[in-house]
């Protein structure tokens, strides 16, 4: 159970990389889990659905409903996602915890890197966020 942490399973610096794909938003304490990732590994890599993608914004703003998209396919009442976030939210969390972002990539639902527009407006046009990070050096 990731919500219980990794201490019972791994010692400090057991790995070069710790990867969590499409799971962070479904944990009880994402910030504590990121800390655990960096305790057992030198670097972390996470991916998560971007709640600020334009399609989610449109559903919330114009229809007044919690978004249901290909990357957020469940209704609000049966979703495993308990901590939805945006690129900006994740970057603020990292800053508060002394975590350095080494690389950020945003992709569409088919995992393709976008056009220059996606690079210009990643929080609006990126459907999935991918971050590589470490403790501040």
Describe every region a protein language model picked out.
Residues 1, 24, 28, 113-114:
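Short gly/ser/thr-rich secondary-structure transition/capping motifs
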Residues 1-9:
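Adenosine-cofactor binding site in Rossmann-like domains, unifying the SAM/SAH pocket
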Residues 4, 25, 53:
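Active-site micro-motifs of SAM-dependent methyltransferase domains
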Residues 8-9, 16, 61-66:
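Short, flexible segments with low predicted structural confidence
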Residues 9-11, 37:
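Structural alpha-helical scaffold elements that stabilize or flank donor/cofactor-binding regions
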Residues 13-14, 40:
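Alpha-helix C-terminal capping/helix-to-coil transition sites in glycosyltransferase folds
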Residues 16-30, 48-49:
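A short SAM/SAH-binding and catalytic strip from SAM-dependent methyltransferases
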Residues 32-36, 43-137:
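S-adenosyl-L-methionine-dependent methyltransferase catalytic module, highlighting the catalytic core
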